UniProtKB/Swiss-Prot annotation:
Entry function: Involved in targeting and insertion of nascent membrane proteins into the cytoplasmic membrane. Binds directly to 7S RNA and mediates binding of the 54 kDa subunit of the SRP.
Protein name per its UniProtKB record: Signal recognition particle 19 kDa protein
Assembly and binders: Part of the signal recognition particle protein translocation system, which is composed of SRP and FtsY. Archaeal SRP consists of a 7S RNA molecule of 300 nucleotides and two protein subunits: SRP54 and SRP19.
Keyword Ribonucleoprotein on entry: yes
Naturally occurring in which organism (per UniProt): Desulfurococcus amylolyticus (strain DSM 18924 / JCM 16383 / VKM B-2413 / 1221n)
Gene Ontology cellular component annotations, sorted alphabetically: signal recognition particle
Keywords: Cytoplasm, Ribonucleoprotein, RNA-binding, Signal recognition particle
């Protein structure tokens, strides 16, 4: 990511929206809004549907050693609002 894009994109790790994770394990949104075990593929697809221009990076979440991958998305509103939107879109995709 170049310096001129700094501040215009946010990082989304699956743990941020995972209802199976506690707040101390990295969940950022409320349990009621989170989804169980979101995959990188689902996050990318949901972000595409929302027009957030996702970009995959093979980095692991510092708090958790298992699982690799994070997604950078356009910051079109606040971080928590975007995370809730992505989780909601994943819920819709799962039916």
């Amino acid at each position: 990511m170049s310096r001129d894009n700094k501040g215009r994109r946010i990082v989304v790790y699956p743990a941020y929206i995972d209802s199976k994770k506690s707040r101390s394990e990295g969940r950022k949104i409320s349990l009621g809004k989170a989804v169980p075990n979101p995959s990188i593929k689902e996050i990318i697809e949901a972000s595409e549907r929302l027009g957030l221009n996702p970009l995959y990076e093979e980095k692991h979440y510092p708090r958790l050693k298992e699982g690799k991958g994070r997604v950078l998305v356009d910051k079109k509103s606040g971080k928590l609002e975007i995370l809730r939107m992505i989780a909601d879109e994943i819920r819709k995709m799962r039916g």
